[in-house]
Amino acid sequence: QSCLEGADVMIEASRLEAPEPLFHTEWVRSGALVIPYGTQSTVEDDFTDIMDKIVVDHWEQCLIGPFGCLRRHVDGGKVTRDTIHGEIGSICAGELAGRENDDETILFWHRGLSTSDIALGWAMLEKAKRLEIGTALDYT
């Protein structure tokens, strides 16, 4: 609680076996960026009620499988295509506004796209080259 309550950025990446609220709604301050990323829901049912914007990486991914921090919210109809602000790609492409003021409370639900993995892998490879670290492997 001392790490999360009133924080500017709240990130969770647990691997719980069953849903359990780790993020409590009353801990979220106005203007926070919240990224619950674990396999099970770690937020309370009313958590999405205080969000000014809910952003996802890819809406169709949010509908697949039994896992994800907002699974219960999607299955219950609380989070829908109409209630989310949009997808992160639309924000990055300038087609949709991102944060518009310091008081906006934003939740980003990152389900995990392979393009994210590829981009992160590329960034890691470039950094390793720049620092001249790592071992090159021959894949032929």
Go through each PLM region and give its residues.
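Rossmann-like adenosine-cofactor binding region
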Residues: 2-78
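Adenosine-phosphate binding glycine-rich loop
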Residues: 45-140
